[in-house]
Amino acid sequence: MAKTSNNTKTVENTIPDEVSIETVETKPLSMEEKIMLKNLANWMVGFNKIESNGEVNINAGGSIRVPRAEVISQYENGNKLLRGDGDGTHATIYIDDKATRDYLDITSELIDKNKVKKIFAINGLDDFRNEIYKTFTTQAEKVLLIKIIRECGFNDFNKIRECEVLCGMTV
């Protein structure tokens, strides 16, 4: 800002004396580190390994730890169990490691009891219907929805009926 007095002009310094720069150190991902994979399906799933010999099998609703390099290789080679519809949404196997999900640009959320409770909290049957049709598209997700409804004991007939119509199963 400029001030004038007695025909002289003084200028105040508006530049800060110290500029603080935050540096965030990012460590490279360790490809040998084992990360958690969760099977969202109500049946056993598996795939052949790319990085080494053998296969990975995950029991229904179970989880297993697999080297990050194997998971990234499977994802980049188009494993539908991990990729779902192509970008990680609607996948049968959930990658439960934030660093790996960020590396692969996966933004989908885990479908669990909390997510279903949030969906059941939606007011209005039309909005609820739109959300369940958008969220639960694969057979594994539909079976999971019915299972969670049974476990949580929801008591909204119209919403439960809508889920039954979508899934083709009864609660």
State where each predicted segment sits.
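Arg/Lys-rich low-complexity patches in intrinsically disordered regions that function as generic
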Residues: M1-N7
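Compact, well-ordered interaction domains used in eukaryotic information-processing assemblies
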Residues: S20-E109
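N-terminal intrinsically disordered, low-complexity tails
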Residues: N7-T26
